[in-house]
Regions:
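A short, Lys/Arg-rich alpha-helix, primarily the initiator
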Residues: 1-26, 30
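Residues in the helix-turn-helix
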Residues: 26, 37, 72
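A short, basic/aromatic helix-end/turn motif that makes direct DNA contacts
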Residues: 31-33, 61-62
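Recognition helix of helix-turn-helix/homeodomain-like DNA-binding domains
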Residues: 33-48
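Key DNA-contacting residues within the recognition helix of helix-turn-helix
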Residues: 39-40, 54-57, 74
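DNA major-groove recognition helix of helix-turn-helix/homeodomain DNA-binding modules
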Residues: 51-70
Length: 78
């Protein structure tokens, strides 16, 4: 991996971050969750709580200035 490139994962959150130019460190700072915690979610190794989803969605809205929905970032089960 070359400098300036980050590893990408096949999750909605990670694809959205890449498409919108949101860096993991910025999302961590804005959401209040650690980069390590967000990495586990981005990589699909951990399911976020409802509270965590709400915080990440709010952070993505602030960072992108777009009306982001939870369903754009996460696979929401029934």
């Amino acid at each position: 991996m070359s400098a300036g490139k980050r590893k990408t994962y096949n999750t909605k959150l990670d694809r959205w971050m890449a498409a919108n130019g949101v860096k993991p460190a910025h999302l961590a700072q804005e959401s209040g969750y650690s980069r390590q915690h967000l990495l586990r979610i981005r990589a699909g190794r951990m399911e976020p709580t409802r509270r965590c989803i709400a915080e990440i969605v709010a952070a993505c809205r602030r960072l992108s200035h777009k009306p982001v929905r939870a369903s754009e970032l996460f696979e929401l089960g029934d």
